[in-house]
């Protein structure tokens, strides 16, 4: 009997393979063919274009075990995860599909056969639902399968509109749609709940295990349902639900996969109560987080990366709640790989990257979590009602980086309501402020709407004849311009490359008899290319012919930098891992900037390896091959496509040997050897999960190396050596400096001890307490604490205030012996003095430090100390 989740997965795929279905691998959690989807959330996602007739496959029957995530957007189960028996951020959807092949009868028979014959589920435990008017499905269930009429439940339009029903599926307001039939399993009368369609249907007794969608109509914009020429079938069965049934448990969190993950999480954190809901949350979240990272998503502050970050942080918060004191989440990855079996193949290949990414995010959040929980606890302790206001929730999010859903989680556990409307209002107000600020210095040319087209000839030509088809000044269309006028010119054809894909627009000239227009930038305006610049000489009107001349030197240098970004991208993926994807770039004649996804600083050894890899490919002098092809063909060849970019059906593919292949519309060198030299000048983080490399090529790289050599020679001269001995001599100087600093510190301690002996005599007695207040000249701030400790030991029961002024700054220290902290607290004392010298400070009751910016007030401030102390000792 099939019982483990892995066995059920294999049995399902084998069943449909034996019935003529092509077994298709699970697609990525990042949809490659649907920009409207945040994550893959159903088995049919990867076949959407097939169902729409836009993609042809060499099979008409398919079966999959699809990885899915529902956390963010329309399908968001995050808030319920861990608190119910069946909500998950990650799940596997088993499915079988027919693309114009079999239809209702075969689909129903396949489902019933697998459940009752292969898995041997008792038929009396099963009931089915159909759409209210789907008599064909009723006949198949009743006559062909033998399900009693009372166990076939018709579901009508129960969502408030025609065809808005649990049993009618629609891709959108228009397009493919059709009725569906669902199979439910009865867990038994010991669990509350009623049959589907009954008032108690929300209970957990009857659980949907299989949904079969019959795509048989095309919904017209008028609402008319037109029959599809080739009806199709889309089915789905959640593996976690069927595993619970086969393993004799009611909750999905009791199946083998979750039992193993919960046990491991409990072991790592050190808890024994395996029924704790926080363990459920952690066990669920490691699945979605690990597989998302494996599919190329990195924690960030936007889009998919932000959802991933929220899930990781929710898991970490629940670990913290259980008592976790160090990073634990990433340690679950090996167990996850073990329990997921064949479904974890891609995860196993990226295990090291996944663990590093999760650990880095967890450690980064630990600091935010501790601070945020403290502030939230304080806010909740002061709450008089049962609602936490939106302003406080927003402040936690905006100032301290504490996600709203985590605030809601904590409040939920304490039966506190979160003012979500107030939070959203505060968010909207912030967006308005940001937009208002962002309007300053806006490029009003970007608002130009140009109804024209410009042909581009700049891949092969840098000079060409063209006709002026439009002229714009200050956003308005004009017919002519004169010398000195700034304008945007549109040509019918141009060799000028318009800014796109990170490559800056070309510069150059448009010339004719007595006419010279300097092009300072080139931008796209829809299908038109705008040449922005100034008319230096002559007059120019629409319809005139000009010679368009691109600045060859600038274009050449830009091409070097653009081509090398492709080599850099490929090298980063080789050295750091395939999770690296381009997040942005800037390519101009002077340098290149390349932003990419990565969870930590790139190590110097890794940077060196990347640089060496790129320069090796440059020396190999690969010919750059450019070809146009269908986007599907390009992807099959392994061409890198950028997430978020929209591509036409025909794309331009740039290949450099066997090292790099990318979709790209930019301009490039003829051979990699033209680049000459590649030199990285900096690497750093620009956002969480996003790194930036800046580099130079060609002559700029040679100049950079020459500058470094000159600086090295200058350093060698200062150290009185040659360039080969700089490191050794510098190390010797640093060692010498450390010894001098050590000697100086010892000398300062001796001086402080001597000074303390002299200062003891300056103490005055107030109500039996030694009080010493002193301004010290020539004493460094770092020596104050040691001096204060020495004085405390000598004076025994004492209150001490010392101050020093150096380079326009005041440093203060207050010390109170332990027997006196009940009457005088050092923190309050030093804060009083600091306030009078333009500063602030604080500390423990027995010792506190402060600073200030008004040394001219130090004497007067210290004069206030004795009366202040006397009052408190009275």
Swiss-Prot record:
It comes from Shewanella sp. (strain W3-18-1). Keywords: Aminoacyl-tRNA synthetase, ATP-binding, Cytoplasm, Ligase, Metal-binding, Nucleotide-binding, Protein biosynthesis, RNA-binding, tRNA-binding, Zinc. GO terms for biological process: alanyl-tRNA aminoacylation; negative regulation of DNA-templated transcription. The keyword Zinc applies. Consists of three domains; the N-terminal catalytic domain, the editing domain and the C-terminal C-Ala domain. The editing domain removes incorrectly charged amino acids, while the C-Ala domain, along with tRNA(Ala), serves as a bridge to cooperatively bring together the editing and aminoacylation centers thus stimulating deacylation of misacylated tRNAs. Pfam families: DHHA1 (PF02272), tRNA-synt_2c (PF01411), tRNA_SAD (PF07973). It comes from the Bacteria. Zn(2+) binds at residues 562, 566, 664, 668. Belongs to the class-II aminoacyl-tRNA synthetase family. Catalyzes the attachment of alanine to tRNA(Ala) in a two-step reaction: alanine is first activated by ATP to form Ala-AMP and then transferred to the acceptor end of tRNA(Ala). Also edits incorrectly charged Ser-tRNA(Ala) and Gly-tRNA(Ala) via its editing domain. GO terms for molecular function: alanine-tRNA ligase activity; aminoacyl-tRNA deacylase activity; ATP binding; tRNA binding; zinc ion binding. Binds 1 zinc ion per subunit. Coiled coil: none annotated. Its main location: cytoplasm. The gene is alaS. It is found in: Cytoplasm. Its EC number is 6.1.1.7. This is Alanine--tRNA ligase. It catalyses: tRNA(Ala) + L-alanine + ATP = L-alanyl-tRNA(Ala) + AMP + diphosphate. CDD domains: AlaRS_core. Its cofactor is Zn(2+). It is an enzyme of class 6 (ligase). GO terms for cellular component: cytosol.
